[in-house]
């Protein structure tokens, strides 16, 4: 995954 996508993906998955 891309750097931007990975960041958003992990951030959303944290919830």
From Swiss-Prot:
Subunit field text: Homodimer; disulfide-linked. Also exists as oligomers.
Tissue: Hemolymph.
Post-translational modifications: Glycosylated. Contains mannose and N-acetylglucosamine.
UniProt KW keywords: Disulfide bond, Glycoprotein, Hemolymph clotting, Secreted
Disulphide connectivity of cysteines: none
Gene Ontology biological process terms, A to Z: hemolymph coagulation
Localization: Secreted, Extracellular space
Annotated coiled-coil segments of the chain: none
Main localization of the protein described in the UniProt heading: secreted
Entry GO CC: extracellular space
Functional note: Forms stable clots in the presence of calcium.
Protein's UniProt name: Hemolymph clottable protein
């Amino acid at each position: 995954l891309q750097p931007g996508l990975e960041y958003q993906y992990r951030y959303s998955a944290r919830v």
